[in-house]
Amino acid sequence: MKTIHISLAMGAALLFVGCQSTTDSHKVSQHRSDAVFHIERAAAATLAQETTELVSAFVHYCQLPEAGMDTVKKQWHRSMLSWMALQGQERGPAAALEQSWNVQFWPDKKNTTGRKMSALIQQNTTWKADDIAAQSVTVQGLGAIEWLLYDESSDLSRNAQTCQTGVAISRHLNQNTQRISDAWSSNPWVLLNEKEWHSEYISLLSNQLEYAMKKLSRPLANIGQPRPYFSESWRSQTSLSNLKANVEVLKALYLANGEGLDATLRGMDKAELADRVVNQFDVTLATWPEQTSLFAALQDKEGYRMALTQLRKLEQLKYLIHDEVAVELGVVIGFNATDGD
């Protein structure tokens, strides 16, 4: 399968962040969390923009199906990659966090998306965005659109009504991502003192890192008994591309344009620890597999070992942030709501 270039979606977001760090400094009251907030706000804005483009791509495809699905598929990938910046968050504006399941239903342990989408397109209904909002979350988000574009059971290419269903789902998704962007228009952390912010910051990183780790550990399951259908984007075969984007975003959040945890540690004369964290990010990304499909990798022992190796690297990263960095900052990380589910 053609390699998905992460920089397409993530590069735009990080460029936007770099611009904001200088242009917004005179507009926003200075707070130790500002650099991280700018990243989050830019990521949310990028997600909303990419899903706006997804609506346009879907509408164009439905009008000219003979042009093929390539454009809408590429735009779906861009939208998915932009979502990786916010995926797994448990810190931030409540109005943004409450949209998570609407944007993406995962894990899907029982192929609920497949069953619900099959039932949806079989109904003799011209769906609108408002109608989709009243349906199960499994047919509302990125996974539902992936099913339409990639699943063998989808009749998208030969059924105009199914195509309009795709437009409706895309529009509803765009509305929800715009709500996320709106929620990130102001900094939710401005009232936190230094210790509270450090706790929130480390929790933000830990939550997203742990979510990314689950995207490997669930499909890996028990040694010798993988569950490839538990992979995040198994239909489009882009699970590993998504995960690389997760790690890239976590590194950007950790560094926060020179104003993040890395700078904090160095200011405390903990450069050795800071170097180890950065090195772990760098090694993880530099050795990330070219293969984009976790589903395909789990079909043989070599691929399983490769995926397990990536998980071990993320576990080391978690140890460094969750234990060593947190201890140096005097932060105690509490129970994570995603643990044990």
Which residue stretches match the model-derived regions?
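Bacterial N-terminal signal peptides that target proteins for export
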Residues: M1-L8
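C-terminal motif of bacterial Sec signal peptides marking the signal peptidase cleavage site
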Residues: L15-G18
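Short, conserved catalytic or interaction motifs in soluble domains
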Residues: S21
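Mature extracytoplasmic or organellar-lumen-exposed domains after removal of signal/transit peptides
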Residues: D24-D341
